[in-house]
Curated annotation (Swiss-Prot):
Its biological purpose: Component of the dark-operative protochlorophyllide reductase (DPOR) that uses Mg-ATP and reduced ferredoxin to reduce ring D of protochlorophyllide (Pchlide) to form chlorophyllide a (Chlide). This reaction is light-independent. The L component serves as a unique electron donor to the NB-component of the complex, and binds Mg-ATP.
This protein's UniProt keywords: 4Fe-4S, ATP-binding, Bacteriochlorophyll biosynthesis, Chlorophyll biosynthesis, Iron, Iron-sulfur, Magnesium, Metal-binding, Nucleotide-binding, Oxidoreductase, Photosynthesis
4Fe-4S in keyword set: yes
Organism name: Methylobacterium sp. (strain 4-46)
Cofactor: [4Fe-4S] cluster
Oligomer status and interactors: Homodimer. Protochlorophyllide reductase is composed of three subunits; BchL, BchN and BchB.
Gene: bchL
Protein name: Light-independent protochlorophyllide reductase iron-sulfur ATP-binding protein
Sites where the protein binds ATP: 45-50, 74, 215-216
Length: 301
């Protein structure tokens, strides 16, 4: 693993912009100018980690240097890549009594399948502390040591549909936000709230919506209807296949599973998605619905 640590650079204090909420002004020297950065959001349990990990591998199959950052206290974003629960940033910081300058890259960065580099933020014990704070500190640490600059693609796999505080930190650094959803009420309802959060963050940061990834769904009719109504687009569609479940049990990515016609079609879809994202997808200016309007809009089979 050939990643150098440079001296940390301090960020500027928080300042209030004319629009949006209180934001932290990033030092221009800390901006990620050498990589394409994607933040993956979606309802809890929708398959963001599965999607993120296989997308990371797809990018690596295209010859890109990839860093996946798990932003969930469960620290299980990257285990199909690393074949284990990787050490977390918060554990590494605790080991050096939060003297970040004492950390080595190998203390919290693990190389996974096909060279994908993996980082897990970790978090406080269940029911205590603020997971959002931990994610914010992880992003700060990675930027201070310039680790994000050593890659072509950065994939943030973000906790559930929580888009406030530290869990919104990836939006400060992302070029495109991707939303994983299923063709059901709860997933689309959560997607609408995520659209609203990204819309607010886009006032002060460069992040823009990239599109929607349909997952665990035989059909996409409700997703497509919602997309048309608010100004989104579907980038890929992955059905609910048993090979996905088996890959998780084997602690493996889909790219490591035994070939079959249905799996080959899934892998082709991931590679096509990676190619499209690398080539660049047009930013979307989606307008979220009000909750009650969305409630009336969805359903009625």
């Amino acid at each position: 693993m050939n990643i150098a640590i440079r001296n940390p650079v301090a960020t500027r204090p928080a300042e209030r912009r004319e629009e949006g909420s209180l934001q932290v002004a990033l030092d221009p020297d800390l901006r990620i100018d050498t990589a394409k950065v994607f933040a993956v959001y979606g309802k809890g349990g929708i398959g963001k980690s599965t999607t993120s990990s296989n997308l990371s591998v797809a990018f690596s199959k295209l010859g890109k240097r990839v860093l996946q950052i798990g932003c969930d206290p469960k620290h299980d974003s990257t285990f199909t890549l690393t074949k284990r629960l990787a050490p977390t940033v918060i554990d590494a910081l605790e080991a050096v009594k939060f003297h970040a300058e004492e950390l080595r890259v190998e203390d919290f960065v693990v190389e996974g399948y096909n060279g994908v580099m993996c980082v897990e933020a970790g978090g406080p014990p269940a029911g205590t502390g603020c997971g959002g704070y931990v994610v914010g500190q992880t992003v700060k640490l990675l930027k201070e040591h310039h680790l994000l600059e050593e890659t072509d693609v950065v994939v943030f796999d973000v906790l559930g549909d929580v888009v406030c505080g530290g869990f919104a930190s990836p939006l400060q650094h992302a070029d495109r936000a991707l939303i994983v959803t299923a063709n059901d009420f709860d997933s689309i309802f959560a997607m609408n709230r995520i659209v609203a959060a990204i819309h607010a963050k886009a006032k002060n940061y460069g992040v823009r919506l990239g599109g929607v990834i349909a997952n665990r769904s035989a059909a996409t009719d409700e997703i497509d209807r919602f997309n048309a109504a608010v100004g989104l687009r579907r980038l890929a569609h992955f059905q609910d296949l048993d090979v996905v479940r088996r890959s998780r049990l084997r602690k493996a990515t889909l790219f490591e599973m035994e070939s079959s016609p249905e799996l080959d079609a899934v892998l082709a879809e991931y590679l096509a998605l990676a190619e499209a994202l690398w080539a660049g997808v047009e930013p979307l200016e989606a307008e979220p619905m009000r909750d009650r309007d969305l409630f009336e809009f969805l359903g009625f089979d």
